[in-house]
């Protein structure tokens, strides 16, 4: 629901959502979104899947340059002509990231984008997202149930309660990067969030 509101697919019952100075009332190119599954077109190559994300009118040369730039950005140079079935799960998600970024959105929304990946690929993709964030400097909003992932990636964590969904806490993560998951402050933040979810589960809310 939160991501639908931000992207303009749903409307708040009160208040406003703004991206920059624009009040969000409908979907726009300001926001790109990455889902839990890559959702690529199986009959299209990597190049064509990324190209499919372009909705702006561009000249042919600029279009080619933009596509190649984003394929290179996600580390898939040399795989331009590969089909999704020829790629690993992590590589498929890289294609979806390139497709979401190719329109140059101001905000990138990530809806549990690594939930379907194995543990090692998930960690590698978290590092990849940080690398892309450092290169692109986009605002990224990540929805995740993985506490370590939230601490590792985020500058700020918003902890939501369930039914009804409310903001329980906002935690600033003032840790230098790259972050050590075994570090004292990392563990302290993890414990704090764990305690909330444990209390929430015991309370039945």
Regions found by a protein language model. Give the residues of each.
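Conserved ABC transporter NBD signature motif
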Residues: 15-27, 63
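Short helical segment in ABC ATPase nucleotide-binding domains corresponding to the A-loop/adjacent helical element
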Residues: 47-55, 64, 68, 172
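Hydrophobic anchor residue at the start of the ABC signature
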Residues: 97
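Catalytic Walker B motif of ABC-type/P-loop ATPase nucleotide-binding domains
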Residues: 108-111
